[in-house]
């Protein structure tokens, strides 16, 4: 699968370079190609460095980065296709309304603020994904099996410095950190989940209730909230049911869906501001 993906991205990059004069994005496909090459190296290092946690987490983040770049490329190409004239027809009223933000200064201010807060949300979400990757790479997903925080006495086990360091070991399979450090990783990931949930929940609700948000943004905001609630349910299920494989895989998959929905929201903001300036 990895080889097929690499060949597809290589083909995309070659086509983009050849079609660069037609307005097709070039830098993004080239960035994708570089990410694929780096991903291949991380995959090799995962084996040769005996599951070094930094490499395992980097491999996960690299996969999310490749998926994000592919999605952004899709959005840009779709938007370019929509801009192409079709039999000299003018856009319909519904098409113009979908991305219009109006002439009111408040609408423009809302879009600029939404762009800022959506980027902050992206940073929060990526940080939480990285924390999840670090927790998983160090086999700390089951370090805490009680709610809402951890087993009693967890306060005495907190070791931030140790939890986010890489101990010397010949092999990192099944983890090389002690129990207290794994508890710390798990708890930080839980608190990160709370922060991420509250922030994205507030962001999504603001989009839904604002009269300055476009129809597309409201749709994306609603989808993001559904993905967010699903992700929380999957995270709780991982703890309650002791990390079943299917739930763990879905937890990663929905994290990717949540990331893509947030990227889509950001794209709609740029599209609205761009249409307003045109």
Task: Provide a role label for each language-model segment.
Residues 1-91, 95-278:
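Polytopic transmembrane helical bundles with strong interfacial aromatic enrichment
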């Amino acid at each position: 699968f990895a080889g097929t993906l690499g060949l597809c991205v290589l083909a995309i990059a070659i086509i983009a370079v050849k079609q660069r004069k037609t307005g097709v994005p070039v830098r993004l496909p080239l960035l994708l190609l570089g990410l694929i090459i780096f991903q291949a190296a991380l995959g090799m290092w995962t084996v040769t460095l005996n599951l070094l946690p930094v490499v395992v987490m980097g491999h996960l983040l690299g996969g999310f980065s490749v998926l994000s770049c592919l999605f952004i490329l899709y959005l840009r190409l779709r938007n370019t296709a929509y801009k192409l004239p079709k039999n000299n027809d003018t856009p319909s009223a519904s098409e113009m309304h979908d991305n219009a933000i109006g002439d009111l200064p408040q609408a423009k201010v809302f879009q600029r603020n939404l762009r800022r807060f959506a980027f902050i949300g992206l940073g929060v979400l990526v940080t939480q994904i990285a924390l999840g990757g670090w927790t998983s790479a160090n086999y700390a997903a089951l370090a805490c099996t009680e709610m809402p925080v951890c087993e009693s006495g967890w306060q005495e086990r907190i070791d931030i410095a140790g939890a986010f360091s890489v101990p010397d070991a010949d092999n990192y399979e099944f983890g090389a950190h002690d129990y207290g450090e794994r508890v710390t990783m798990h708890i930080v990931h839980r608190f990160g989940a709370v922060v991420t949930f509250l922030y994205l929940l507030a962001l999504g609700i603001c989009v839904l209730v604002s009269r300055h948000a476009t129809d597309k943004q409201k749709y994306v905001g609603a989808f993001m909230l559904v993905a967010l609630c699903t992700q929380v349910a999957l995270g709780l299920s991982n703890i309650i049911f002791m990390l079943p494989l299917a739930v763990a895989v879905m937890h990663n998959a929905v994290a990717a869906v949540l990331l893509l929905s947030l990227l889509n929201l950001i794209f709609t903001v740029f599209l609205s501001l761009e249409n307003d300036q045109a």
